[in-house]
A protein has these predicted regions:
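Secondary-structure boundary elements
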Residues: 40-44, 83-90, 121-126, 268, ...
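A short, well-structured juxtamembrane/interface segment
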Residues: 2-18
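Catalytic core of membrane glycerolipid acyltransferases/transacylases, capturing the structured
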Residues: 19-72
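Acyl-donor binding region in acyl/amide transferases
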Residues: 273, 309-397
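Glycine-rich phosphate/pyrophosphate-binding loop shared by adenosine-nucleotide-utilizing enzymes
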Residues: 297-302, 340
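Non-catalytic C-terminal accessory region of glycerolipid acyltransferases
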Residues: 44, 75-223
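Short amphipathic alpha-helix that is part of the acyltransferase structural core
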Residues: 234-278, 284, 288, 292, ...
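Conserved N-terminal entry element of GNAT/NAT acetyltransferase domains
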Residues: 212-249
């Protein structure tokens, strides 16, 4: 039986390609426990394990058999691993390839093989680190010191002598594959750093790699449609998409979905907060221009509007989002009357290449038409570092 906390459960992605990487303290029970844990969240998981474990009839289809002793694996095996991941599925890998032994009076894995890194980079899959707590019996470690192959014969005994005991499992935050590129470090060195990162989970210490939290789940479409329908209708597009002006004074389904989609979109261009959603204090009193597909009950994109006449900012206040980014000097007070701060816009990736951004600007035009006292539109613009510097210099006045 295993024990796991709520945060660890939240760190298990429910969909999409992913490689789970774990230490290997027990040699059998740990693999079965992690497999049971991950399969309780998603049914598409497979585990890389010794070819002999494929003979366990009830769960043989959940294994991809590899030869841990010689490390001589066929092209077909490697291809099946890559195909499984590229099909947006999950896989569990123990890079040590064998059970932990004692070293310097500590139970820890030996050197890690770097195959999991090659799979991650080849498939552009994120890695989710898992630390498994536990030890085998003193007899096992004594046998390991005397005769390493002999100790392997004791693993069957170790599998059954832990009845009524709990295995502690900690699942860390996801590591995007881009964060595995550490300049001049070799794959072997990066694999060793990943090993240290995973052992840091034991004490909840800060890890080595930059991580991302798993996005919150998508909000209920019916709840979204209901909340958006209570907003102010600004119009409809030619293809019948609705444009609404909405308020979110609490962490409602609409605000949570806006925060989720913002983070999803910004991550897609190498940005984002790395948190479960992108929401700040301004979202609770700003308004949101939402482009909504009423038929599919789905948000296509949104803009955030700060209505200055409602917010009543002052030069030295931080009531506006832009006041946290820029210093408003004397003479800029004119923006604080009859003005609208625009920002935090997004079109979720699946709608890139459509007219969604044009529709959002049509929505802004509809707002100005409905509220003709509006004189100033202003706000910040993020320019991705992915643009070459000469291009950025041309954009910035």
């Amino acid at each position: 039986t295993y024990k796991i906390d709520k945060i660890s459960l939240e760190n298990i992605p429910k969909t999409g390609r992913v490689i789970f990487v774990a230490n290997h303290p027990l040699g059998g029970l740990d693999g079965l426990s992690v497999l049971r844990l991950i399969s309780s969240v998603r049914t598409d998981v497979k585990i890389l394990a010794n070819v002999y474990l494929k003979k366990i009839e009830p769960i043989k289809d959940m294994f991809i058999g590899i030869d841990n002793l010689t490390n001589l694996n066929t092209k077909e095996t490697l291809k099946s691993i890559i195909t499984h991941i590229e099909n947006e599925k999950a896989i569990i890998i123990f890079p040590a390839g064998e059970v932990s032994r004692t070293k310097n009076f500590k139970v820890q894995d030996g050197a890690w093989r770097d195959g999991f890194l090659k799979f991650a980079k080849k498939t552009r899959a994120p890695i989710v680190p898992i630390f498994i707590g536990g030890k085998n019996s003193p007899l096992f470690y004594l046998a390991s010191m005397i005769n390493r192959p002999l100790s392997g014969l004791l693993l069957g005994h170790e599998l059954f002598n832990k009845r009524d005991k709990f295995i502690n499992i900690k699942v860390g935050e996801m590591i995007p594959y881009e964060n595995l590129n550490l300049g001049d470090f070799s794959n072997a060195e990066v694999a060793n750093l990943m090993k240290k990162h995973i052992y840091s989970l034991k004490k909840d210490s800060k890890g080595i790699f930059k991580t991302q939290q798993i996005l919150i789940k998508a909000q209920d479409p019916n709840a979204l449609a209901d909340e958006i329908s209570r907003g102010e209708k600004l119009g409809f597009t030619r293809d019948n998409k609705g444009i609404y002006l909405c308020e979110t004074k609490e962490y409602s389904p609409l605000l949570l979905e806006l925060g989720r989609l913002r983070e999803l979109t910004f991550r897609s261009v190498g940005e984002g907060t790395n948190r479960r959603y992108d929401i700040d204090k301004f979202d609770l009193y700003y308004k949101h221009l939402v482009l909504f597909d009423d038929e599919k009950r789905e948000i296509i994109g949104a803009y955030r509007l700060g209505i200055t006449d409602e917010i009543a900012p002052e030069i030295n206040s931080e009531k506006l989002y832009t006041q946290t980014l820029f210093d408003y000097g004397a003479g800029s007070e004119f923006l604080f009357s009859n003005g609208v701060e625009l920002g935090r816009s997004f079109v979720q990736p699946k709608f890139w290449g459509s007219r969604a951004l044009d529709y959002l600007w049509i929505g802004i035009g509809a707002y100005v038409k409905k509220y003709p006292s509006t004189r100033y539109l202003f706000g910040p613009v993020s320019i991705s570092v992915s643009y070459p510097r000469p291009a950025r210099n041309l954009i910035i006045y």
